[in-house]
Amino acid sequence: MKKEILKEIREPGKSRKKKGQPKGRRNGFLEGLTGKDFTAAGLFFFSLLLCRLFVLQYGVFGSSIDWISQHSTLADYFRKRFYATGNLFPDFAWNLGGGQNIYHFAYYGLLSPTVLLSYLFPFIPMDLWVMGSSVLLYAADAVLFYRWISKKGLHYGNCLFTSLFFTCSTALLYHSYNQLMFVNYMPFLLLALLGVDRHFQKRKSGLLILSVLGMILTSFYFSVGGLLALTAYAVTEYLKCGTENAAYEAEQENRKVSRNQKAGAEKKQRAGEKSAGTGETLVGLRSFFGAAIRFALPVLAGILLSGILLIPSAAALFGGSGEGGRGTAAGGIAGLFTDPAMWKPQFLILRLCYTPYGIGLSAFAGVALLGRVIGKSRLREKLLSFLLLVFFCIPLFGYLLNGGLYSKDKVFIPFLPVLCAEVGLYVENQLVRKRECGKNRSTGNFKRKVMTELRELLPYLIVLILMWNAKQETYFEPYWHLGILDVICVTACYLAWRWFPAKKRLRGRELPFLPLVFSAVILAFAGKAINQEKHVMIPRKTYEALTDSKIAAAIREIRAEDPGWYRMEQYGDGGQNLANVNRIWDIGQNVSTIYSSAYNAEYKKFRDETYGINEAFRNRMMQTVSDDPLFCQLMGVKYILAETRPEGYELYRDYGDFQVYRAISAAPVAYVTDQVVSETEYKSLPYPQNQEILETAAVIPDQEMRKTTAAIPDQEKSAKSVDNFRAAADSDTKNGSVGPLFHSCFQKVNLEIPETDQEDLRIQKTADGYEIETKKSVTVSATLPGAAEGATLLAVSFEVENQKASHDMFIRINGQTNRLTGINHTYANGNTQFNYLVTMKEDGTVFIRMGKGHYILKNFETWTGMAQPLEKTEQLYSQAVTLIGGTTATYGGDGITGVVSAERDGYLITSIPYDENFVLKVDGKETMLFRANTAFLGAKIPSGEHKIVLVYHAPGRAAGSWCSLMGGMLALILVICEKKKQQNGSERAGESKMLQKQRKYYIIRV
């Protein structure tokens, strides 16, 4: 009886008339449209309505988290670079982070189809394109999911409300305007699921290949979870139709044998059908592995096609770059498999429910998943639910999908479609069981019925307990009551519907999806609450100020007047600095800032440890603009757009809302000098002398210094040591070996912070610093007794011990901020050494802003001083490299060409972060590169005039190109073979029909 009902309800591919199902329209321009088309259109507009209600009424469809600083700005840079160079597959980004491997930004859509499509529409601003495409992709998710689920043979109402359930996922909408790569691959994943069905039903792989390719190009990080979900779905779909596949394989084998072997082939076919029919959960190994290979080949073709992105990105991530995250367990990835904790199940219900950083469904998803696993059905029917439960509960999978860095629930978002499909099948099976109950009400004993009902009710009780235990979670606490209400409502709906007499219907309908309806409604309210509670939408006025076209016009105007090779940055408050960290207004603009999950590790180490600039943000991957005037000079920041004048800069132009300041003496991006010190000597200098010396000398490796010293005669050594700048010793320098190198313009002073002991604020002086406890952020004024006359710069350095380690704390001195992140933050910056180098106020007052918390400041030291004399810095920078054609004319923007004239043998010094994949040619001859200033490109240069060519070759680029070529060939072979099989099949079908006609004609004649 159950088998007949299942066949009646779930048999795919047949058109059934159901009560309440929309009929096809046959009038006017609507002719040919079916009820499914109108339902899909309704879901499309419903998605747009959610975007309006949840996001757009509060601001633009973008957030202040990563959207404004990464997704919109980096996509805009990719397009600008393409327009300037015409290079669709670049290797290097000269404009960002001082110069970075462009595959550090591959995560943000370097080759994403939606970004590449924007190249055809230069008249549409990229931020508007990103907003519009995100809205359309979200709406496409709803439509494609409905198209996929409606092919499962489910009740029309079940398909509709399962699609609404999917659309209301908090993760799907929230990340459509926050971290786009979390969800922007979803349309391709849904197309791939349709491609799996098409592959098994029609033996066509084109859709599957293209969908896998699109998913990887859009978000290679989340495509791993997507491929795992695809594989699990493909295995279960194959096992569900195991009988048909076994019979098909036997038929194929039968066609290959001759007539003399027909009896044996028929025997093999009968044996295959018998094993498939009796086992019902397994198929023959030969058939299974054959199907597995046929499925793996198109997936492999899609992966190989994306090699042009995957291999260079992997080389950039694991070949010496930095990457965000906590790090793996001991032993790396392999160590995860031997760690017993990785195999211990964890039942984290919030991994599925109510948080945008998980799958983001309601509690009913957990009920359905457990119900499918616990329920009475064949193993092959609930295998997918069982696999999903294993993926969600075994910690090993969370770590592996996160690359071994940490266990974050975001990597399970690709399982959203298959989980929602299991929810729909759970509801459908409830209808089947109720029909069975109605038709067999008098059969069966009471004890069996009670046990069946308890088994059906058990998932609701388990989820209720899990939700109650999770209510204390930080991000779930504001709306845990919605989760409890959800479980109670769906349980009540289930009981009311389950025990309602089977033959009595509600207005002629059985409504098996009533719990799903209530759950979808509660999920929609939860989504509204979550989006409001996060409150990361950007108000329109703020967005318009950040993207003001006047800024772009000013930068283009400056570039037209001064087309040299330098850097130009914006400095404002914290929100502006974060929003502009990756923003390039004009392709000629270069910045020293970068915010990416991957970056040049040499440059990051130089900023944080060697040079010691301030860290203003809690995320350690944010390498934002600094108002440290010596760092700006070192990095060649010639122009700064700001509201106040930094030390060492003069007003260049006033645009009303902002001003442009020009450096009096900024370093060229590349220059030649012979004023050098060894790396050992440099590292012996304390702060702030380690910053100050780079105004008058460059740092080269010890071995290069020894070569230079050995090549200079003794008399020249003596003359050279007296000449140039190595004259006066610094009385404040702690290491005597560095004393003769330069004369420091800084001297130690005492910074006196007034002590206080109030209810909300306590400041107590200690032996080597201060202990501060404040219940809110406060600003205090400090004095500098004994400050040097004419001092313009203030340097402060101290260590921080945070007494509330789980909470953030910050200290801001004269507008410059240092922040220490709580230890529980995933991307905690670990910034316990606070360094400040700021411009002093005219009256000498120091304003200190202290953040809420309890912390101890140790080894508190203060200096005042001024920049090195102008003649010394000009002498260091006098032999600058002049570019020919800018940074876009050589090798598709992956190289630069310049000329330089060196008076004496010296060194090429740059502020381009060191990377071993650079190739330098001086007058056509390849020259060895080394680390200058401990982290930048440098090389030995002889005297005379030279032509310099510096080219970057992204590692893995050639291998990726060959991989994509192989993938294209494999895809072409698969398509051709499938076409031939279809043609042969149609020819055999035609021959069979002809034989039948001939036989019929013969019988009639006889």
Residue ranges and their predicted role:
Residues 226-300, 490-495:
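Perimembrane helix-loop-helix junctions
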Residues 98, 104-107, 520-542, 557-631, ...:
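Extracytoplasmic/lumenal acceptor-recognition loop(s) of multi-pass membrane glycoenzymes
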